[in-house]
């Protein structure tokens, strides 16, 4: 059996690993996405902005990657909203490239 857990903030990562998670997933919604689309067009299935269910800064993602390197439990980033409009794909690509550049390479993608 594989335990997969949703991460709401980077502070939860170590607790999830210690509790036995084999894999973690999270949403990353940078400011540039929120500024342009807000939650009218969410980036993933966790559409709320004002609760602790999204990571919102690249600096936090860099810290999370360092934790992944230490604890060896992978993190998958979600881009799995029900649909995207054509103009969003360029920004999604940029966001994914930013994440790849800091070491993330597993994504859940839907359109």
Features from the language model and the residues they span:
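Non-catalytic helical/linker scaffolds that mediate oligomerization, partner binding
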Residues: 1-110
């Amino acid at each position: 059996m594989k335990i997969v857990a949703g991460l709401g903030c980077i502070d939860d990562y170590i607790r999830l690993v210690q509790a036995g998670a084999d894999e973690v997933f999270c949403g990353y919604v940078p400011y540039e996405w929120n500024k342009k689309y807000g939650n009218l067009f969410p980036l993933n299935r966790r559409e709320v902005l004002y609760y602790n269910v999204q990571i919102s800064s690249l600096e936090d993602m860099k810290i999370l990657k360092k934790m992944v390197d230490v604890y060896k439990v992978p993190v998958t980033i979600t881009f799995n909203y029900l649909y995207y409009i054509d103009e969003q794909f360029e920004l999604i690509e940029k966001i994914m490239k930013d994440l790849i550049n800091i070491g993330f390479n597993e994504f859940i993608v839907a359109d």
